[in-house]
Structure formats: C-alpha cells, structure tokens
C-alpha cells in the first residue's frame, strides 16, 4: 500500500513543471529530515568545502548552525545555518550569509551534485591536482554566489514565480496575488495547513519575523490545541 502511494506520488511529480516538482520534492524532504541527518549534511558540506573539492584553494566555506536556533522543539521552522567564506591564508571573513532550512537543503543538493562531478573529473584526469585547481579555482566564491541568490530571491511558494510579499508564522512565503486568492476560501497555510485564526497573522517580507517571533507563535498555537493533559 505504501509503495503504491509512493509510486502514485512520483507519477504526479513527473507530470509537474520541473521547477514546481523540485519545490515539492524539497518540501517533502525537509518534512522527513531528522535532526541528526541535518547535522550530518552540515558536516558533509564542510568536508566538501575544505577537505575535498576546495582543498588546494585560498578560500573555503564554513557552515555552522547558528547558536540557539536549533534548541526549540520546532527547530525546522527556526533553525538557521550560517555560511561564511574565509580566506585561508589571512583568516579574514570575506562574506557571511544566513539560510533557513529550505534554502540550506537547496544548497546542499546543488553543492553535492556539482562536487560529485568535479571529483569524478579529477579522478579520471592524468594530473588530478592540476585539474582540480583549474576546475575549482573559485569554488568557494561560486558557492557563496549561490547562497546569496537563494537568500536574496525569496519566491512565492505557490506560483514559484512572483517575489514573496508575505511570510506566514510557519515561515512559508507567498506573493500577495496568490495568498489573496487562497485566503478567499481557506484560513490555513497552503503548504503545511497551519491554521490562521486572526486577520493579521502574516508579516510583510520587509518586516520578517525573528526566530523568537515564529517559535513563540507556534508554542502558543500548541498551548491552545487539544485537551488538557494531567500526568
């Protein structure tokens, strides 16, 4: 039964436009990701950015979980990963960006896919060191550019086209046109179905909520849900 459902889901994904299918896959993956798997991916990117692909380069990327952002039971909503580009010879931090979980998963897929190709090319070269140096001479800068793109271009989670104007307390973002059309009939998030009980339960992107804002909101929702429990 489970296999049949999985096959049907994959069949639907195959019929979707590539960009939308990729988004659906990322949302599903972030939903099933465990905390241990998340930390493993952070460590894997650090390994690729220093010990493997960028081992002979002047610059490398360092990925760290922002202290305190993963301490909540709702860590998937509030966790942040800090990506820092560092000059190895001087130790100077040249750039730094903060990503949410969805953006991090996108970057993880991009980097691991690209790195596997670079490493495969290096392994078949007659002079692996020379090939690695030429192919990945600016790898840290290229990857940092991708981080900047992900964090600068927040897209609408519905149409995947318009720039996001609003962000809901669950951290999903939408353009005004799409969320207006959805909210005519529904009072929940189109992605995760989190209920919106008030008329103003959203933030404009320019006034995006802090991690504490989102965590407190979800904790309040949990307090109001269900029946009192007496151990």
Curated annotation (Swiss-Prot):
Chain intervals annotated as zinc finger (RING-type): 156-193
Zinc-finger is among the record's keywords: yes
Lipidation (N-myristoyl glycine): 2
One CC-aspect GO term: membrane
SMART domains, sorted: RING
GO function terms (MF aspect): ubiquitin-protein transferase activity; zinc ion binding
SUPFAM superfamilies with a match to the protein in the record: RING/U-box (SSF57850)
Range of residues in the leader sequence: none
GO biological process: protein autoubiquitination
Keyword terms of this UniProt record: Lipoprotein, Membrane, Metal-binding, Myristate, Zinc, Zinc-finger
Subcellular location: Membrane
UniProt topology in membrane: Lipid-anchor
One family name in Pfam for this protein: zf-RING_2
Xref: CDD domains: RING-HC_RNF141 (cd16545)
Top-rank taxon: Eukaryota
Listed InterPro entries: RING-HC_RNF141, RNF141-like, Znf_RING, Znf_RING/FYVE/PHD, Znf_RING_CS
Its biological purpose: May be involved in spermatogenesis.
PANTHER family, A to Z: RING FINGER PROTEIN 141, RING FINGER PROTEIN 141-RELATED
Name of the featured protein: RING finger protein 141
Originating species: Canis lupus familiaris (Dog)
């Amino acid at each position: 039964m489970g296999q049949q459902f999985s096959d049907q889901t994959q069949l639907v994904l195959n019929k979707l436009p590539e960009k939308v299918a990729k988004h659906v896959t990322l949302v599903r993956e972030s939903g099933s990701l465990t905390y241990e798997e998340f930390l493993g991916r952070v460590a894997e990117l650090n390994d690729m950015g220093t010990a493997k692909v960028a081992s002979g380069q002047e610059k490398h990327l360092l990925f760290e979980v922002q202290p305190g952002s993963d301490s909540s039971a709702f860590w998937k909503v509030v966790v942040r990963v800090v990506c820092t580009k560092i000059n190895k010879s001087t130790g100077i931090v040249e750039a730094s960006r903060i990503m949410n979980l969805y953006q991090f998963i996108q970057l993880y897929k991009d980097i691991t896919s690209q790195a596997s190709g670079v490493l495969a090319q290096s392994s078949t070269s007659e002079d692996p060191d020379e090939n690695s140096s030429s192919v990945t001479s600016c790898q840290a800068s290229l990857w940092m550019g991708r981080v900047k793109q992900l964090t600068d271009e927040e897209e609408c989670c519905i149409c995947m086209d318009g720039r996001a104007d609003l962000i809901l307390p669950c951290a999903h973002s939408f353009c005004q046109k799409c969320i207006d059309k959805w909210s005519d009939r529904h009072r929940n998030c189109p992605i995760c179905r989190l209920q919106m009980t008030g008329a103003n339960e959203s933030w404009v992107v320019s006034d995006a909520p802090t991690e504490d804002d989102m965590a407190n909101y979800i904790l309040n929702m949990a307090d109001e849900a269900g029946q009192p429990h007496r151990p």
